[in-house]
Amino acid sequence: KYGYRATRELTGHGVGKELHEEPMISNVVVGPASKTPVIKLGQTLAIEIIYVEGNPKLILEEDGWTISVKDGTLSAVHEETVMVTQDGCSILTVPSLFQIV
């Protein structure tokens, strides 16, 4: 509706003994539902959505850490950490004030 796109290059993921674990959770539909990860009771998941104003291609900057939008347009990320429960999910992320970086 507003022209923003979700990037395919970064994903949400499971969180456990390691920060980044399976399942990888895509920001966009990439195949049939039968091929999407199965979410299980007790799993903790980081749901990360990166929106971009222009082309969603990303680049890794020379510092080896910073990721930018290749065409230089604006981008934003929203992330929530949730735990799958018997009743659905519990949001574990602590609310904070928005910070423009």
Language-model features and meaning:
Residues 1-27, 34-37, 43-56:
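Conserved, well-structured core segments that form or line functional sites
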Residues 30-101:
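Charged, cofactor-coupling segments
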